[in-house]
Amino acid sequence: MTLSHEQADYARKRIVEDGVADQVEIRVQDYRDVTDGAYDAIASVGMAEHVGEAMLPVYAAHLYALLRPGGRLLNHAISRRPGPRVRTSRTSFIDRYVFPDGELEPLHVMVAAIEGAGFEVRDVESLREHYALTLRCWVANLEERWDGAVTASSPGRARIWRLYMAASALGFQANRIGLNQILAVRPDHHGHSGMPRTRAALNGAER
Protein backbone atom coordinates (compact mmCIF):
# COMPACT_ATOMS: atom_id res chain seq x y z
CA MET A 1 0.00 0.00 0.00
CA THR A 2 1.50 3.32 -1.07
CA LEU A 3 0.50 6.72 -2.39
CA SER A 4 3.50 6.76 -4.73
CA HIS A 5 2.95 5.48 -8.26
CA GLU A 6 6.73 5.22 -8.67
CA GLN A 7 7.01 3.01 -5.58
CA ALA A 8 4.13 0.87 -6.78
CA ASP A 9 5.67 0.42 -10.23
CA TYR A 10 9.01 -0.57 -8.71
CA ALA A 11 7.36 -2.98 -6.25
CA ARG A 12 5.35 -4.64 -9.03
CA LYS A 13 8.55 -5.08 -11.04
CA ARG A 14 10.30 -6.66 -8.06
CA ILE A 15 7.54 -9.14 -7.21
CA VAL A 16 7.58 -10.34 -10.81
CA GLU A 17 11.37 -10.73 -10.70
CA ASP A 18 11.11 -12.62 -7.40
CA GLY A 19 8.36 -14.91 -8.68
CA VAL A 20 5.74 -13.92 -6.10
CA ALA A 21 3.40 -11.82 -8.26
CA ASP A 22 0.60 -14.33 -7.68
CA GLN A 23 0.96 -13.92 -3.90
CA VAL A 24 1.31 -10.14 -3.53
CA GLU A 25 -0.97 -7.26 -4.45
CA ILE A 26 0.46 -3.74 -4.75
CA ARG A 27 -2.07 -0.93 -4.34
CA VAL A 28 -1.90 2.83 -4.78
CA GLN A 29 -4.36 3.71 -2.05
CA ASP A 30 -4.74 5.81 1.09
CA TYR A 31 -4.80 3.65 4.21
CA ARG A 32 -8.06 5.30 5.27
CA ASP A 33 -9.74 3.93 2.13
CA VAL A 34 -8.85 0.32 2.93
CA THR A 35 -12.01 -1.45 4.06
CA ASP A 36 -11.38 -5.10 3.23
CA GLY A 37 -10.07 -7.49 5.84
CA ALA A 38 -9.85 -8.79 8.39
CA TYR A 39 -6.07 -9.10 8.18
CA ASP A 40 -3.76 -11.39 10.11
CA ALA A 41 -1.01 -8.78 10.28
CA ILE A 42 -0.21 -5.24 9.16
CA ALA A 43 3.25 -3.70 8.79
CA SER A 44 3.34 0.09 8.59
CA VAL A 45 6.82 1.26 7.57
CA GLY A 46 7.73 4.94 7.36
CA MET A 47 4.12 6.05 7.20
CA ALA A 48 3.16 7.19 10.70
CA GLU A 49 5.56 10.15 10.38
CA HIS A 50 3.20 11.60 7.78
CA VAL A 51 0.00 11.25 9.81
CA GLY A 52 0.52 14.03 12.36
CA GLU A 53 -0.11 13.90 16.10
CA ALA A 54 -3.74 15.01 15.82
CA MET A 55 -4.55 12.12 13.48
CA LEU A 56 -2.55 9.37 15.21
CA PRO A 57 -5.59 8.10 17.19
CA VAL A 58 -7.58 7.84 13.93
CA TYR A 59 -4.65 6.08 12.25
CA ALA A 60 -4.26 3.54 15.05
CA ALA A 61 -8.00 2.94 15.34
CA HIS A 62 -8.30 2.23 11.62
CA LEU A 63 -5.46 -0.29 11.70
CA TYR A 64 -7.07 -1.92 14.74
CA ALA A 65 -10.38 -2.24 12.88
CA LEU A 66 -8.65 -3.90 9.90
CA LEU A 67 -7.14 -6.69 12.02
CA ARG A 68 -8.83 -9.86 13.20
CA PRO A 69 -8.68 -10.70 16.93
CA GLY A 70 -5.12 -11.93 17.46
CA GLY A 71 -3.93 -9.87 14.50
CA ARG A 72 -0.56 -8.14 14.80
CA LEU A 73 0.66 -4.66 13.98
CA LEU A 74 4.30 -3.74 13.33
CA ASN A 75 4.67 0.04 13.34
CA HIS A 76 8.08 1.24 12.12
CA ALA A 77 8.61 4.99 12.43
CA ILE A 78 11.18 7.70 13.05
CA SER A 79 10.71 9.56 16.32
CA ARG A 80 11.98 12.75 17.94
CA ARG A 81 13.13 13.35 21.48
CA PRO A 82 10.43 14.25 24.06
CA GLY A 83 9.77 17.90 24.71
CA PRO A 84 8.38 20.90 22.86
CA ARG A 85 8.61 20.86 19.09
CA VAL A 86 11.50 23.12 18.07
CA ARG A 87 11.78 24.60 14.59
CA THR A 88 15.38 24.76 13.34
CA SER A 89 17.10 25.42 10.03
CA ARG A 90 17.45 21.63 9.68
CA THR A 91 13.74 20.93 10.18
CA SER A 92 12.84 23.83 7.88
CA PHE A 93 15.09 22.33 5.18
CA ILE A 94 13.40 18.93 5.55
CA ASP A 95 9.92 20.47 5.56
CA ARG A 96 10.63 22.40 2.38
CA TYR A 97 12.68 19.97 0.32
CA VAL A 98 12.30 16.41 1.63
CA PHE A 99 9.14 15.65 3.62
CA PRO A 100 6.71 18.58 3.38
CA ASP A 101 4.08 16.71 5.40
CA GLY A 102 6.44 15.05 7.88
CA GLU A 103 5.77 15.38 11.61
CA LEU A 104 7.93 13.39 14.01
CA GLU A 105 6.52 12.50 17.41
CA PRO A 106 8.16 11.10 20.55
CA LEU A 107 7.95 7.35 21.00
CA HIS A 108 5.56 7.64 23.94
CA VAL A 109 3.03 9.53 21.80
CA MET A 110 2.97 6.71 19.26
CA VAL A 111 2.69 4.06 21.97
CA ALA A 112 -0.19 5.96 23.59
CA ALA A 113 -2.08 6.19 20.30
CA ILE A 114 -1.64 2.48 19.62
CA GLU A 115 -2.71 1.49 23.14
CA GLY A 116 -5.58 3.96 23.01
CA ALA A 117 -6.97 2.17 19.95
CA GLY A 118 -7.21 -1.09 21.91
CA PHE A 119 -3.91 -2.73 21.00
CA GLU A 120 -1.65 -4.45 23.50
CA VAL A 121 1.97 -3.40 22.93
CA ARG A 122 4.13 -6.52 23.11
CA ASP A 123 7.58 -5.25 22.15
CA VAL A 124 9.43 -2.04 21.31
CA GLU A 125 12.81 -2.11 19.57
CA SER A 126 15.15 0.79 18.83
CA LEU A 127 16.95 0.66 15.48
CA ARG A 128 18.60 4.06 15.89
CA GLU A 129 22.23 2.97 15.48
CA HIS A 130 21.27 0.63 12.64
CA TYR A 131 19.66 3.50 10.75
CA ALA A 132 22.72 5.73 11.13
CA LEU A 133 24.75 3.01 9.42
CA THR A 134 22.05 2.50 6.79
CA LEU A 135 22.02 6.20 5.91
CA ARG A 136 25.79 6.24 5.51
CA CYS A 137 25.53 3.27 3.15
CA TRP A 138 22.83 5.07 1.17
CA VAL A 139 25.05 8.15 0.85
CA ALA A 140 27.95 5.98 -0.35
CA ASN A 141 25.69 4.24 -2.89
CA LEU A 142 24.35 7.58 -4.11
CA GLU A 143 27.85 8.94 -4.60
CA GLU A 144 28.95 5.79 -6.44
CA ARG A 145 25.99 6.14 -8.81
CA TRP A 146 25.89 9.91 -8.90
CA ASP A 147 25.56 10.37 -12.65
CA GLY A 148 22.63 7.96 -12.82
CA ALA A 149 20.91 9.65 -9.89
CA VAL A 150 21.30 13.06 -11.52
CA THR A 151 19.90 11.71 -14.78
CA ALA A 152 16.93 10.14 -12.97
CA SER A 153 16.13 13.34 -11.04
CA SER A 154 18.27 16.51 -11.24
CA PRO A 155 21.58 17.79 -9.85
CA GLY A 156 19.74 19.82 -7.22
CA ARG A 157 17.52 16.95 -6.11
CA ALA A 158 20.50 14.60 -5.83
CA ARG A 159 22.40 17.16 -3.71
CA ILE A 160 19.37 17.66 -1.46
CA TRP A 161 19.10 13.95 -0.73
CA ARG A 162 22.83 13.55 -0.17
CA LEU A 163 22.78 16.42 2.34
CA TYR A 164 19.62 15.16 4.02
CA MET A 165 20.89 11.60 4.46
CA ALA A 166 24.35 12.67 5.65
CA ALA A 167 22.89 15.09 8.21
CA SER A 168 20.28 12.58 9.34
CA ALA A 169 22.98 9.97 9.97
CA LEU A 170 24.57 12.41 12.42
CA GLY A 171 21.19 13.02 14.06
CA PHE A 172 20.59 9.33 14.64
CA GLN A 173 24.15 8.80 15.86
CA ALA A 174 23.80 11.64 18.39
CA ASN A 175 20.38 10.38 19.60
CA ARG A 176 18.61 13.54 18.49
CA ILE A 177 16.18 11.40 16.49
CA GLY A 178 15.30 7.73 16.80
CA LEU A 179 13.83 4.85 14.86
CA ASN A 180 11.53 2.43 16.63
CA GLN A 181 9.55 -0.68 15.80
CA ILE A 182 6.47 -1.25 17.92
CA LEU A 183 4.93 -4.72 17.84
CA ALA A 184 1.33 -4.76 19.03
CA VAL A 185 -1.56 -7.20 18.93
CA ARG A 186 -5.35 -6.95 18.91
CA PRO A 187 -6.39 -9.33 21.71
CA ASP A 188 -9.59 -11.32 21.38
CA HIS A 189 -12.59 -10.59 23.62
CA HIS A 190 -11.17 -12.90 26.29
CA GLY A 191 -7.88 -11.00 26.33
CA HIS A 192 -5.95 -13.75 24.55
CA SER A 193 -3.15 -12.43 22.36
CA GLY A 194 -1.93 -15.63 20.74
CA MET A 195 1.58 -14.20 20.98
CA PRO A 196 4.72 -15.99 22.28
CA ARG A 197 5.43 -15.41 25.96
CA THR A 198 9.15 -14.64 25.61
CA ARG A 199 11.19 -12.41 23.35
CA ALA A 200 13.33 -15.38 22.32
CA ALA A 201 10.22 -17.20 21.11
CA LEU A 202 9.01 -14.02 19.43
CA ASN A 203 12.27 -13.86 17.47
CA GLY A 204 12.08 -17.55 16.55
CA ALA A 205 14.94 -18.68 18.79
CA GLU A 206 12.58 -20.88 20.80
CA ARG A 207 10.07 -23.34 19.43
Segment roles from a protein language model:
Residues 44-49:
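Residues lining the SAM
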Residues 27, 43, 74:
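Conserved Rossmann-like nucleotide-binding pocket used by diverse enzymes
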Residues 34, 50-51:
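A short His-aromatic
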Residues 1-34:
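Class I SAM-dependent methyltransferase SAM/SAH-binding core
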Residues 32-43:
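A short acidic, Gly/Pro-enriched loop at the edge of an enzyme's catalytic core
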Residues 78-192, 200-203:
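Substrate-binding/catalytic lobe of Class I Rossmann-like enzymes that use SAM or dcSAM, i.e.
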Residues 27, 38, 54, 163-169:
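Flexible, glycine/threonine-enriched loop-and-boundary segments that flank and lead into catalytic domains
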Residues 57-72:
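A short glycine-rich, Lys/Arg-flanked "PGG" loop and its adjoining helix->strand segment in the class I
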